[in-house]
Amino acid sequence: MITVNVDLGDRAYPIHIGAGLIGRAELFAPHIKGSSVTIVTNTTVDPLYGDALRAALAPLGKRVSTVVLPDGEAYKNWETLNLIFDGLLTDRADRKTTLVALGGGVVGDMTGFAAACYMRGVPFIQVPTTLLSQVDSSVGGKTGINHPLGKNMIGAFYQPQAVIADIGALTTLPDRELAAGVAEIIKTGAIADAEFFDWIEANVDALNRRDPAALAHAVKRSCEIKASVVAADEREGGLRAILNFGHTFGHAIEAGLGYGEWLHGEAVGCGMVMAGDLSVRLGLLDEASRQRLDAVIAAAHLPTRGPALGDARYLDLMRVDKKAEAGAIKFILLKRFGDTLITQAPDEAVFATLAQTTH
């Protein structure tokens, strides 16, 4: 097992990475102070890992209940969030009840948001079971739900007590979900660590094959980078925005097609292709680096062409973005691997990028 720490003073927490961790009670025990635990999971993950988690928690002598949500990005909304509150209130959960998010990014984001809101804040633990949630969404305290007009527009910054990332859970992950997670790994290397990006290029096939050593290294390094960024800028005042490379275009794709048509990581992968193209058009990035970025995204079996939503529709969707100010779209663009720039772009350049990267 590897442990990475997120250094946030008195709200610091560990990220435990390894195989078989869901069944290890000693990883959960230090973070459960009250007499009850509510597991929040979904219809896909509960049959796979719910019993193992409940068995791990049993020796702790806590009252354990489970809320099972429908699976998919389309359910990341108020109605599903209320199912969590319904379960907590029915079970008479109190302020010391610990929520445990067992699932991917949707489960983690909604459980964290429920924890932030219920009785004005109860503790929660992240147990991410997808590659994307292990390398990205479970770390950093971003929680929330989607709105029909924009992704993740309703939420809170609320840190977990711990992240327990069991890479053994990745063996049951569908291929599309695995590729979606590799997209966030590529993003992390591209924005923050040129050497890690080199490693990803050399090992993308190993990641596609689910090689345990490659997955463990990718999760560890991605978490180290995200932890350092979050520690420096927890509430996305500046530096943390670089983690949204590929997300401005990507969120527009997700909202434009309807949540769940493309996986989040698929949209981010394509969004990175689009952001790379725009980076070259604005004279920030060299063409050879853009081609390297496109090649590794394609090698991860991610889409490299976006849907033809229309120029005006893309702009409208990108203006409904947490980085936008007074309706001005802000893009995270590459100068070189490991070096980014947050900037606006002329509409003409954006339209040229859309013409080149959509179909």
From Swiss-Prot:
Its EC number is 4.2.3.4. NAD(+) binds at residues 71-76, 105-109, 129-130, 142, 151. Its main location: cytoplasm. InterPro entries: Dehydroquinate_synthase, DHQ_synth_AroB, DHQ_synth_fam, DHQS/DOIS_N, DHQS_C. It is found in: Cytoplasm. Binds 1 divalent metal cation per subunit. Can use either Co(2+) or Zn(2+). CDD domains: DHQS. The keyword Amino-acid biosynthesis applies. Zn(2+) binds at residues 184, 247, 264. GO terms for molecular function: 3-dehydroquinate synthase activity; metal ion binding; nucleotide binding. Pfam families: DHQ_synthase, DHQS_C. GO terms for biological process: amino acid biosynthetic process; aromatic amino acid family biosynthetic process; chorismate biosynthetic process. It is an enzyme of class 4 (lyase). Pathway: Metabolic intermediate biosynthesis; chorismate biosynthesis; chorismate from D-erythrose 4-phosphate and phosphoenolpyruvate: step 2/7. Its cofactor is Co(2+); Zn(2+); NAD(+). SUPFAM superfamilies: Dehydroquinate synthase-like (SSF56796). GO terms for cellular component: cytoplasm. Keywords: Amino-acid biosynthesis, Aromatic amino acid biosynthesis, Cobalt, Cytoplasm, Lyase, Metal-binding, NAD, Nucleotide-binding, Zinc. It catalyses: 7-phospho-2-dehydro-3-deoxy-D-arabino-heptonate = 3-dehydroquinate + phosphate. Catalyzes the conversion of 3-deoxy-D-arabino-heptulosonate 7-phosphate (DAHP) to dehydroquinate (DHQ). PANTHER family: 3-DEHYDROQUINATE SYNTHASE, 3-DEHYDROQUINATE SYNTHASE, CHLOROPLASTIC. Belongs to the sugar phosphate cyclases superfamily. Dehydroquinate synthase family. This is 3-dehydroquinate synthase. It comes from Burkholderia lata (strain ATCC 17760 / DSM 23089 / LMG 22485 / NCIMB 9086 / R18194 / 383).
